[in-house]
C-alpha cells in the first residue's frame, strides 16, 4: 500500500519560494559583503569558494538596514563571541560614547543581541548567527520590517539555504542547529525515564522571574510574502533570561510577563495545536526562548518537514495509538504538525490479516537529495487518510463528523462529551438528527452484515440536550490570538444552515460576525422550507441560541441590496462577506397553463403554509416532483384540505430522489404516488386550474447520467384537480444585492467561486450552500459554512494565504468488500417508538419519538469500530499535540529516542555531523548492495 504521491496540481500547486531582487544600480558595499561572509553558515560562501554578491541574501539582507560603519564594527566582534563595551572599544579604537551608540543602534535594529552572562554581570554584546539570531530579531522589529519588507524573505532564505546539504546527516538531538521540539508536559508526566530538559517546567523554573512575551518572527516573516496563516503574531514566543530584557528594551515588541501568564500562553498554544520549541544552540544548560509554533509558518519546523529529516526537530518521544481505544475521530490527524498521524482501519482484510501501513524512509536508509524533499509539506501533512481508507461513516458525511467517536462516548454514557465531539464538525446536530439524509448510515459497514447502525437516531438523542438550557453545550472558543479575539468585521448574508455554520466557526475562532437575514426569523429553509412535523421550530431556535451565545449578532428583516448595500457595509468597516442566501425561489416546468390560479412553486407554498401552519386549499391537489420537497408539499397539503393528494414524478419509485423513509411516511398518510410521468399541460377553466395532463416518461437520464428526460407523447393521462404544486427545481433570488458588483455567475444564476476557498470574483465576497452548489441538504450547507469561515479568517488578515496548509477534508472509505468481521454484537437495529399514524397525519406537530437511553446503549454497541488512527514513527516529532486532542485516551507519547534530547552547542555541530555523515554513508552504501 502506498500513500498518494501525485497530488492534484489544481488543489496542490507546486510551491514557489519567495525571492527578492536588489537594485542593480545601488553601489556594491564591501563592508556589508564582508560581514555577510562572517556570519553565514553556507559552506561555499563561508570558505570563500563562492563570493558574496549583491544577489545573495547575506548581502541584501544586511545592506538595507545597516550602515557601512555598523558593518565594519560588527565584523570585528566575531560570531557568538560576547564582548563588553570596554573590550569592543579597545578592539575598534572608537571613542566609547560613539561605540556604545553604534552597539545600541545595532541592537535596536536586531543585528546584535546582549546579555550579562559573565562573572561580573557586565553587559556584553553578541553578534549572533543568522538563524536563530539576527534574522529573527530583524523581523521582530516592526519598524525595520515596515521599511524593509525584504527582511521577511531574508529570514526565509537564511533558515533554508544553509541547511540544504547537511540536514540528512544531522544526528539525533539536532547537533546544535536551530530549534528543538519540547513535548506538551502533560503528555510525559507519567514517563519515569524523562529528563529535566524535556520538561517546559524545568526551563520556566530555571529562568524564574525573567520572561517576556514577544512576537513570532516566523509569522511576521511569512506575511511579507503573502503566506501568513492568520494567527495574530504577537506574544507567542516567550523570551527567557537576559533575552527577555533584550526584546523589551530594543523595540522588539516584547513585554514582561510572570510565570502564570507564561503558562496561559503555553496552554493557549496547545489549544490551537501549536508546537512548543526551545532554542538548541547553547547545549543542555541554556535556552533563550520557548516558541509556540504553527507548522504553516514556522521555519524551525520546516527544517524537518521540508527535507523529511525528523532529527532536525524531534524530541525524544514518539506517539503510539492504543488501537482498542481509538475511534478514528480524526482530531489528532487534523492537528498533527508533521502529518505523522493518518486515519486507517481496525478491521482485518478477508485473509484475516491486519492492514500494513507504509513508513516514510529516513536518510539513514537510502541516498538523500532533493527528490526526497517535500516542498509542499504544509499541504501534504494535511492529507487525512491512507489510500486504503478509514471508517465509511466519517468519509460519507459531508461534514466528516466523528461518528464512530460519538457512538462510543454515548455507549459509555458520556453524553456531554459526545455532543461536544459532534459540535466540532456540526453546529446543528439537533436539526440534522431530524432532517439529515443519513449518508453515514448508507455507508455504514454494519449494513454489510445486517442493518446499518442508527447513527442519526443516536445523534438526535444526544442533541436534544440543547433544548434544555441546563444541559446545553456551549463550545469553548479556540482563538489564535492572545488578545482575546479579533476585531475585524465580517458580514454573513443569509441565516440558513450555511450562514449559521459560517458564523458559528468564525465565533469559535474569535470573531463577532453579523448575520443579515431578510426574513423575520433566522433559519432559512430550515425554518421556512421544512414542515414543523419534521423539524419543530423551538428545536431550531435552541441551536440558533447557542450560536448567539457565542457572540454572533443576527439582524432579521434586513435585505441586502434593498435596505443596505454591500458597498455601504464596506464603508462601515466590514472586511469580508459570506453570501449564503440559498435557492429560495421555486421554478415551474415551462408548460402551458403553469401560471393559472391555483398553481404554486413548492418552496413558495411551503414557506407560507409552514409559517401559518395552514393554507387555503379547496379540492384535489396534484404535486409534481419526486424529491423530499415534493413530499413535504404533499404532506402539508393533506393537513390543509380533506381531499385527494396525488404525486406525479418522472422517476420510478426505486430511483426517486426522495428518501425511502419520506416516501413511506407519505404513503402512510394516504398520499397517492404515481411514478414515470411528466407534466405536459395544466388545464384551465376561467383562469383557474381544472386539471393536469401528464405524459409517460421513458427515460430520465442519458447514457452519461445527465438529466435528459424523454417522453412518449402519445401516452398521456389527465388528472382533474383544483391545485397544482410544482416541485421541479429552485432558483436563486439575488434581488438588487449584486448591483454595482462584479460577481461572476453561472448560466443558472449560481455564484461562480473557487472550489476550495469559495472566493468569488469580488475578492472580499465568499459564497456557500445552495447559492453555490444548487439545492442540496442541510449537512452539505453546514460543511460549506465551515470552509467559508476558514477562508474569511484567512482573508480578513492581509497577506495571508487562503490555501497553503489548508485541510482539504478529503477522506477515503475503506474497502468493504475486503474486510472480515469476525465477531460483533448480534442485536438488531433499535427503532424509536412510532407515532400514531392518524394523529401525525392530522397535525403540524412532530409526534415522532427519540430512542430511549437504554436503546442508545444497545444501538451504539452495534458499531463495528471500523477506523483507527495510525502513526508513522518515522515522521513523528514527539510534540504531543495529538494527546491534547484525544478524549479517548487512545494516543500517548513514549520515550523511544533518548538521543534526541542531547543538546549541543552550535560551535560543535560539525564534530557530530561529520562522523554521523560517514557512518550513515557507509550504512546506505551497504544497504544498496543488499
For the regions a protein language model found, what residue spans apply to each?
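Ferredoxin-like iron-sulfur electron-transfer modules
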Residues: 64, 94, 125, 277-290, ...
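Flanking helices and flexible, charged tails adjoining ferredoxin-like Fe-S electron-transfer domains
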Residues: 8, 338-392, 453-455, 459-489, ...
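FAD-site-proximal beta/loop scaffold in flavoenzymes
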Residues: 595-620, 682, 702-775
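A short, conserved structural fragment
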Residues: 107-118, 341-342, 891
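A conserved FAD-binding loop/helix module that cradles the flavin
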Residues: 771-796
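Beta1-alpha1 glycine-rich phosphate/pyrophosphate-binding loop at the start
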Residues: 401-410, 452-456, 492-560, 587-590, ...
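Short, amphipathic alpha-helical interaction segments positioned at domain boundaries
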Residues: 121-160
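Glycine-rich dinucleotide-binding loop and its adjacent helix/turn
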Residues: 462-484, 542-562, 586-641, 745-761
Amino acid at each position: 500500500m502506498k500513500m498518494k504521491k501525485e497530488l492534484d496540481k489544481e488543489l496542490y500547486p507546486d510551491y514557489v519560494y519567495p525571492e527578492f531582487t536588489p537594485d542593480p544600480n545601488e553601489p556594491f558595499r564591501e563592508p556589508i559583503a564582508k560581514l555577510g561572509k562572517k556570519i553565514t553558515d553556507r559552506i561555499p560562501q563561508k570558505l570563500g569558494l563562492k563570493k558574496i554578491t549583491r544577489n545573495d541574501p547575506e548581502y541584501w539582507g544586511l545592506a538595507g538596514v545597516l550602515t557601512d560603519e555598523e558593518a565594519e564594527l560588527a565584523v570585528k566582534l566575531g560570531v557568538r563571541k560576547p564582548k563588553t563595551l570596554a573590550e569592543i572599544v579597545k578592539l575598534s579604537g572608537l571613542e566609547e560614547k560613539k561605540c556604545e551608540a553604534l552597539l545600541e543602534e545595532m541592537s535596536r535594529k536586531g543585528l546584535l543581541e546582549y546579555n550579562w552572562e559573565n562573572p561580573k554581570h557586565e553587559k556584553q554584546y553578541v553578534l549572533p548567527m543568522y538563524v536563530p539570531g539576527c534574522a529573527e530579531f530583524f523581523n521582530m522589529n516592526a519598524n525595520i520590517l515596515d521599511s524593509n519588507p525584504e527582511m521577511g524573505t531574508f529570514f526565509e532564505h537564511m533558515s533554508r539555504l544553509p541547511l540544504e546539504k547537511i540536514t540528512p546527516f544531522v544526528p539525533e538531538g539536532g547537533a546544535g542547529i536551530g530549534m528543538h521540539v519540547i513535548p506538551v508536559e502533560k503528555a510525559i508526566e507519567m514517563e519515569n525515564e524523562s529528563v529535566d530538559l524535556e520538561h517546559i517546567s524545568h526551563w520556566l523554573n530555571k529562568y524564574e522571574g525573567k520572561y517576556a512575551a514577544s512576537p513570532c518572527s516566523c509569522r511576521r516573516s511569512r506575511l511579507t510574502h503573502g503566506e501568513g496563516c492568520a494567527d495574530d503574531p504577537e506574544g507567542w514566543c516567550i523570551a527567557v533570561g537576559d533575552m527577555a530584557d533584550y526584546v523589551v528594551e530594543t523595540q522588539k515588541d516584547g513585554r514582561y510577563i510572570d510565570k502564570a501568564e507564561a503558562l496561559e500562553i503555553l496552554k493557549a498554544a496547545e489549544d490551537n495545536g501549536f508546537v512548543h520549541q526551545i532554542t538548541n544552540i547553547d547545549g543542555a544548560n541554556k535556552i533563550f526562548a520557548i516558541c509556540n509554533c504553527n507548522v504553516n509558518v514556522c521555519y524551525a519546523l520546516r527544517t524537518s518537514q521540508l527535507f523529511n529529516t525528523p532529527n532536525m526537530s524531534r524530541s525524544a518521544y514518539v506517539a503510539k495509538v492504543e488501537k482498542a481505544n481509538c475511534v478514528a475521530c480524526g482530531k489528532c490527524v487534523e492537528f498533527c504538525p508533521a502529518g505523522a498521524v493518518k486515519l486507517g482501519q481496525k478491521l482485518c482484510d478477508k485473509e484475516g490479516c491486519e492492514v500494513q501501513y507504509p513508513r516514510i524512509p529516513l536518510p539513514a536508509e537510502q541516498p538523500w537529495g532533493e527528490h526526497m524533499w517535500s516542498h509542499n509539506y504544509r499541504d501534504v501533512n494535511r492529507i487525512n487518510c491512507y489510500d486504503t481508507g478509514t471508517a465509511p461513516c466519517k468519509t460519507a458525511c459531508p461534514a466528516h463528523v466523528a461518528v464512530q467517536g460519538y457512538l462510543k462516548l454515548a455507549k459509555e454514557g458520556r453524553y456531554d462529551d459526545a455532543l461536544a465531539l459532534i459540535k466540532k464538525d456540526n453546529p446543528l446536530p439537533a436539526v440534522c438528527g431530524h432532517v439529515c439524509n443519513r449518508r453515514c448510515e448508507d455507508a455504514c459497514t454494519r449494513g454489510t452484515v445486517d442493518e446499518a447502525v442508527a447513527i442519526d437516531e443516536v445523534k438526535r438523542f444526544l442533541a436534544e440536550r440543547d433544548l434544555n438550557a441546563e444541559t446545553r453545550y456551549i463550545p469553548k472558543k479556540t482563538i489564535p490570538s492572545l488578545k482575546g479575539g479579533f476585531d475585524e468585521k465580517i458580514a454573513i448574508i443569509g441565516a440558513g444552515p450555511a450562514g449559521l455554520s459560517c458564523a458559528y466557526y468564525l465565533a469559535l475562532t474569535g470573531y463577532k460576525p453579523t448575520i443579515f437575514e431578510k426574513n423575520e426569523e433566522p433559519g432559512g429553509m430550515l425554518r421556512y422550507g421544512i414542515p414543523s412535523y419534521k423539524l419543530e421550530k423551538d428545536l431550531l431556535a435552541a441551536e440558533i441560541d447557542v450560536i448567539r451565545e457565542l457572540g454572533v449578532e443576527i439582524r432579521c428583516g434586513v435585505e441586502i441590496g434593498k435596505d443596505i448595500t454591500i458597498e455601504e457595509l464596506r464603508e462601515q468597516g466590514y472586511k469580508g462577506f459570506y453570501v449564503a442566501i440559498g435557492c429560495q425561489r421555486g421554478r415551474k416546468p415551462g408548460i402551458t397553463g403553469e401560471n393559472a390560479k391555483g398553481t404554486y412553486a413548492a418552496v413558495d407554498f411551503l414557506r407560507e403554509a409552514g409559517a401559518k401552519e395552514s393554507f387555503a386549499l379547496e379540492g384535489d391537489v396534484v404535486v409534481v416532483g419526486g424529491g423530499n420537497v415534493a413530499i413535504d408539499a404533499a404532506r402539508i397539503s393533506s393537513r390543509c384540505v380533506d381531499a385527494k393528494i396525488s404525486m406525479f414524478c418522472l422517476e420510478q419509485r426505486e430511483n426517486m430522489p426522495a428518501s425511502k423513509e419520506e416516501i413511506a411516511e407519505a404513503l402512510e398518510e394516504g398520499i397517492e404516488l404515481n411514478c414515470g410521468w411528466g407534466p405536459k399541460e395544466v388545464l384551465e377553466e376561467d383562469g383557474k386550474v381544472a386539471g393536469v395532463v401528464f405524459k409517460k416518461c421513458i427515460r430520465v437520464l442519458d447514457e452519461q447520467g445527465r438529466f435528459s428526460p424523454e417522453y412518449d407523447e402519445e401516452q398521456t393521462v389527465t388528472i382533474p384537480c383544483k391545485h397544482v404544486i410544482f416541485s421541479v427545481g429552485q432558483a436563486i433570488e439575488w434581488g438588487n444585492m449584486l448591483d454595482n458588483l462584479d460577481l461572476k455567475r453561472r448560466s443558472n444564476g449560481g455564484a461562480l467561486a473557487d472550489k476550495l476557498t469559495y472566493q468569488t470574483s469580488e475578492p472580499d465576497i465568499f459564497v456557500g450552500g445552495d447559492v453555490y452548489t444548487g439545492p442540496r441538504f442541510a449537512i452539505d450547507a453546514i460543511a460549506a459554512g465551515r470552509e467559508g469561515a476558514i477562508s474569511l479568517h484567512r482573508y480578513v488578515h492581509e497577506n495571508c494565504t487562503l490555501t497553503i496548509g489548508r485541510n482539504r477534508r478529503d477522506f477515503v472509505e475503506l474497502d468493504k468488500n475486503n474486510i472480515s468481521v469476525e465477531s460483533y454484537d448480534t442485536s438488531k437495529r433499535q427503532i424509536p417508538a412510532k407515532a400514531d399514524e392518524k394523529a401525525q397525519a392530522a397535525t403540524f406537530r412532530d409526534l415522532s419519538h427519540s430512542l430511549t437511553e437504554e436503546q442508545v446503549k444497545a444501538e451504539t454497541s452495534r458499531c463495528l469500530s471500523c477506523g483507527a488512527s495510525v502513526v508513522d514513527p518515522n515522521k513523528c516529532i514527539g510534540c504531543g499535540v495529538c494527546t491534547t486532542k484525544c478524549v479517548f485516551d487512545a494516543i500517548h507519547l513514549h520515550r523511544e529516542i533518548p538521543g534526541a534530547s542531547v543538546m549541543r552547542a552550535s560551535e560543535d555541530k560539525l564534530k557530530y555531523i561529520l562522523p554521523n555523515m560517514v557512518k550513515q554513508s557507509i550504512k546506505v552504501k551497504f544497504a544498496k548492495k543488499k
